[in-house]
């Protein structure tokens, strides 16, 4: 089983490394990290449908391990299967919750793209109009050729990464309760000038979708969060999906504790202000809701069918693997479109064939959730696309 991807795509779009040989050390400030006995995996009986349920069950049977504390998987399309394994809290050893809420990371971009494409269908936004038409004060004179809305959607805008609170999980952890606004992120980006001409090459990054969030607010006169709710979450019945609410560091409702390796110690990183990720990665969701999102996007419910072809077109540029929000893979000769998301302690994947004959969504709690994690995708997602 193979997946066509690039080293860059693996490093940026797939972000948790399976490291089962690692040993958990005591939680910072606690006496023990291991549950007394790992709960048995829970899985639904597979319905007929051409995927490797045995491999998925085997993957869950190995959870928890030295890196992964919990895993939730849903497979849909022609045949369905779901399973959960691991623990929701290393202190108590309580079993994982099949419907737990989690930080969905960059899968947020799929929602942002859907909202923008609805505005395009309403003729309130034009794909090939410069972003400065909607945000006239955004770009300084150094941008002699402003990127278009299409460039932002396809990660080809030439915008440089914006401000951040650190480049490693350990650096960011020290600032986890601080607030960095989207406006500050974007201001730091545009102050550097463009990295390249718009449309010259594709470089995945959050900055493109942070600007799109600002565009949505400028065009609608409404908050990004409310537009996402009324245009995507509510129509699709995503009742357990939303945004934390500004700098709120908590995940409200049932959820798993998240862990990362900070200074050589397994540390609880569940509470974390992620508001700087905003329209690029601040969403909280469940696997069932993300499955609804997949069916809603590919089924034409929240992305107009006339624009879905454009969403699923990879631009002919250097490094191109993404359409709008979603990345294209080929697995055993099948074209798959998907998106990963990672925040400290949380790694998420959603993927589907264009005809929805196969879908997969998973959420994994992993200490290495922000590292190159193609092995996790191989373990928890690729068996769903086995021929």
Task: State where each predicted segment sits.
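N-terminal carbohydrate-binding/catalytic regions of secreted carbohydrate-active enzymes
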Residues: 72-95, 103, 110
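A generic alpha-helix surface/boundary motif
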Residues: 54, 113-114, 129, 210, ...
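Short, surface-exposed loop or secondary-structure junction motifs
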Residues: 142-336, 340, 344
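N-terminal low-complexity, Pro/Thr-rich disordered segments
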Residues: 9-58, 167, 171-175, 247-260, ...
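Catalytic loop of the DD-peptidase/beta-lactamase superfamily, centered on the K-T-G motif
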Residues: 2-4, 29-84, 270-387
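Residue-level preference for non-acidic, small/hydrophobic
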Residues: 60, 78, 109-112, 116, ...
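Short active-site loop at a secondary-structure junction
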Residues: 92-150, 196-205, 278
